[in-house]
Amino acid sequence: MLFYSFVWSVLAASVALAKTHKLNYTASWVTANPDGLHEKRMIGFNGEWPLPDIHVEKGDRVELYLTNGFQDNTATSLHFHGLFQNTSLGNQLQMDGPSMVTQCPIVPGQTYLYNFTVPEQVGTFWYHAHMGAQYGDGMRGAFIIHDPEEPFEYDHERVITLSDHYHENYKTVTKEFLSRYNPTGAEPIPQNILFNNTMNVTLDFTPGETYLFRFLNVGLFVSQYIILEDHEMSIVEVDGVYVKPNFTDSIYLSAGQRMSVLIKAKDKMPTRNYAMMQIMDETMLDVVPPELQLNQTIQMRYGHSLPEARALNIEDCDLDRATNDFYLEPLIERDLLAHYDHQIVMDVRMVNLGDGVKYAFFNNITYVTPKVPTLTTLLTSGKLASDPRIYGDNINAQLLKHNDIIEVVLNNYDSGRHPFHLHGHNFQIVQKSPGFHVDEAYDESEQDEMTVPYNESAPLQPFPERPMVRDTVVLEPSGHVVLRFRADNPGVWYFHCHVDWHLQQGLASVFIEAPVLLQEREKLNENYLDICKAADIPVVGNAAGHSNDWFDLKGLPRQPEPLPKGFTTEGYLALIISTIIGVWGLYSIAQYGIGEVIPNDEKVYHTLREILAENEIEVSRG
């Protein structure tokens, strides 16, 4: 009896100390110039950009009111990346944020309340729009959960966001990307990289003091390196998980990943300042335009009068030294989940469909948004919630039993890197292959031969006794990764590539975990129902919006039909470029009859010919 009295007194004290953070934000377009080179519309809160970082403590409550203040037809939603929204601790899945997965989009004029507690997590997280590629236009910020009992000491704390930056609006870039005129699926090349939403940054250091740097890659696409000149970092936290200190001078962060490091300043005043390098992962870019700056130098300044650090070149840096997260170990020892109850094998592919667009696939299925949020379908379907048919055949629904150990195997039949993020859980990384054939040039038709899929009977490396735990992991080119987690958080959890261009291509799945138990814990609240009605989205029904017959999927959005047999990406490219050349020819004839020949005509022609030659396609000038 005394024990229970003690427990309840501790809980009561925790509740008494917890704070409630009431935040009111209106999202709208604001004009900004993050890189100093190009003014554009960014997404601000309350008329300001960058968005504020949110700092809370473990056990605090957040009440964030998000109002859609866009004056156009832009809808939005907000996700708190890495937060479990654990329903067993009183939170609601309706607070997770991905549009048409766990909520309806917030249309202009509507307000949605994100109301949750953060009782069991600490560390570095972030919040961002989860609709289209919106957060690339700045709708993002750090979300830091401070721990009164941090297992390390430091004198100063700095939150550092890394991101790629596009000069064009995300809607324009997405439209050009998902187009038959981009049949190779080449990802949009950013125009710059940002360090804390800007460039040309100087960081002040005091001799003898220790700094906690919380690095977050909040970009849409490109992974980034951070490299220190003549300084060392001690990695102490990854994706909200404390790790045993690991010393390095270089780290690697994909989109969505976070890493906290301790940096010890020089003991005595040095004779010069030093460099911190921020470098794009060039291997993720199909082409590198000559005007693209792949890196920038951040000054680590000890004194205003000291000589500045020289700008380092990428050639000066050994990128292979970046820490491999597979070999990190959680500070709180967690043994390997030694077996699995349910295995999900997902083959990642990029394929053109009949509309000429290149889509991303898990097991030959590309994610297509349903007419009703998946959470709505689950919570209004009664006993049918455990039947995968009601969720449609284009969201890659995976039904998981409560407390089962789940193994997810990802095989990469693509030549690019993919950072995968799971909502609602961390996972153990039990196998992670290197990339294969990264520097080789080979035809797309040879990809299956180049890929090294996971062989359960002959894993490439021993299973770690205490695997690294995080929520976002990089799948290497032509390689594989194996993840395990316990399905102990009932919900509708999005699993997707955090290269947002790949998410727009459909590289996503939905893990529907313990649906009957979730029905017992959660009901759709009035605010949820109101924003759905405002968006003209049904508040009951299957993926197609039908509730009279739950297995009637008539009208469900589906992926386009496949290309005709034998019609390749190269063939499509030849058709498009030949058409362009033909149109160019007709245009030139018309121009010749009415005025001077356009000076750049010959340049356009030769550029198109070069593209054809690179793809080994022959087209006569005609």
From Swiss-Prot:
Domain Plastocyanin-like: 43-146, 192-301, 392-514
Topological category with respect to the lipid bilayer: Single-pass membrane protein
UniProt entry tagged with the keyword Oxidoreductase: yes
GO BP terms: cellular response to iron ion starvation; intracellular iron ion homeostasis; iron ion transmembrane transport; iron ion transport; reductive iron assimilation
Residues in the Extracellular compartment per record: 19-573
Other notes: Present with 2840 molecules/cell in log phase SD medium.
Name of the protein this chain belongs to: Iron transport multicopper oxidase FET5
Species this chain originates from: Saccharomyces cerevisiae (strain ATCC 204508 / S288c)
Gene: FET5
